Amino acid sequence: MLQVTIPGYEWFDEKTNSFGSTKETTLQLEHSLVSIHRWEQKWCKPFLGKEPKTAEECADYIRCMTLTQHVDPAVYNGITAEVMDKINNYIEAPMTATWFSDKDKQGSPHREVITSEVIYYWMISLNIPWECRKWHLNTLLTLIRVCNAKNAPKKKQSRREMMEQRTAMNKARRARLNSKG
C-alpha cells in the first residue's frame, strides 16, 4: 500500500463565480486487481493494454486505487508532479524478490489482451485464493507466473543440451580428480 499526501489548494470556479479550496489530504492507495477491475468497468477498455491513457483516465485510476473513504473529489485535482511520480514508481515496482531467467521466456511476446477478467480466470484456474486480488498487481502477476512455471510439464533436453551438460560434468570431475579421462 502507498500513502501519499496531497497538498491543499485554492481555485476559482468560473461557473459559480466563487472560490473553492481543499485541505491537505492523505490518501492510501493500492494498485491491485480490484482497482483495475473498477477502472475497466468504467472505461470499458483494458488497463494493461498498450494504448496510452488520457490524463482523465490516469486521474480516475488513482480514484480507483484509493482506499481512504470520503475523499473530496476536488482533492485529485491537486495531485502534484512529485506525488504523481511516487504513484507511478509504486505502480511499476516489482514488489517481489522473485525473478525469472531469460530461459523461462517462451518465444515471442504475449499477444493476448489482458483484462481484469482474464486475470480472475487465471486465479480461478490456478486455485489462487480470492484474497490475493487485493495484493499489489505485480505481486499477483508474479504468483500467477510462478504457478504456471511450476505446473508446466518438464521440458525435455535436446540431444545437444544433454551432450553439453555431460561434457561439462566430465570436465569438472576430471579437474577435481586430477585425471585425464
Which residues fall in each region the model found?
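An amphipathic, hydrophobic-aromatic interaction surface with interspersed Lys/Arg
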Residues: M1-W43, F47-P52, L67-K156
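Alpha-helical oligomerization segments
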Residues: L143-G181
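Short, hydrophobic/proline-enriched secondary-structure or compact coil segments at domain edges
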Residues: E56-Q69
